[in-house]
Regions:
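Conserved beta-strand segments of the P-loop GTPase G domain that flank and frequently precede/overlap
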Residues: 124-127, 152-154, 173-174
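Clamp-loader machinery-focused feature within the broader ASCE/P-loop NTPase space
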Residues: 1-134
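Conserved adenine-binding aromatic site and its adjacent loop/helix in ATP-hydrolyzing domains
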Residues: 109, 141, 167
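Short, glycine/polar-rich helix-capping loops at beta-to-alpha or helix-loop-helix junctions
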Residues: 156-162
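Conserved Walker B
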Residues: 127-131, 146, 158
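Conserved catalytic/switch belt of AAA+ P-loop NTPases
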Residues: 112-113, 137-153
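A short helix-turn-beta junction within AAA+ P-loop NTPase domains corresponding to the substrate/partner-engaging
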Residues: 163-175
Length: 175
């Protein structure tokens, strides 16, 4: 990722030292490579930093069994519709999409299970600042006891997160 030397340096150092925090906040404006960096960082956690082409592709396509990638959702006819799918299907809603309590509960369930192919469960939450209070409190509990897992929170407005969430994560600045 071009122009993100500090973020890349901090994450590379963590991988080299094998000192992985249970939570990270990738913070910075939209379009600067936070999601791409999250994928690359997760690749560094797989197979001792030597992921196979198959493993890389599964992370890229977000279909690795030890990875959950959460994005804000709409509720449409009782179903959660990810923001990206709603945009493709031209579903328009009156309320903005958000990270919902059900999604955070799914993370807790996911992290309580033994990873299938890696050393830890991997969770990425995009636009984490869209959470409401209930979801924020549930995420805080998950961060307090992540088990064998890593959470990467991607935010363009980290100041809107609960201070206790921020204090439990290593902040990675993007500019």
């Amino acid at each position: 990722v071009i122009g993100q030397n500090l973020a890349i340096s901090l994450l590379s150092s963590a991988l080299k030292k094998k000192h992985i925090a249970p939570g990270y906040i990738f913070q910075g404006p939209h379009g600067v490579g936070r999601s791409l960096t999250a994928r690359r960082f997760l690749e560094g956690l797989v197979n001792n930093g030597m992921p196979t082409i198959r493993e890389r592709n599964r992370i890229k396509r977000l279909n690795h069994p030890d990875l959950i990638w959460i994005e804000p959702t709409y509720i449409n006819q009782g179903r959660l519709i990810p923001q990206s799918a709603a945009e493709k299907e031209s579903i328009q809603k009156r309320t903005p999409p958000q990270i919902r309590l059900e999604q955070i509960r799914d993370i807790k369930t996911f992290l309580s299970k033994q990873p299938l192919e890696t050393d830890m469960g991997m969770v990425v939450i995009e636009a984490v600042e869209t959470m409401k209070e209930g979801a924020s409190n549930a995420l805080l509990k998950t961060l307090e006891e992540p088990g064998k897992g890593i959470l990467i929170l991607i935010s363009s407005r980290p100041e809107s997160l609960l201070p206790t969430i921020r204090s439990r994560c290593q902040e990675i600045p993007f500019s």
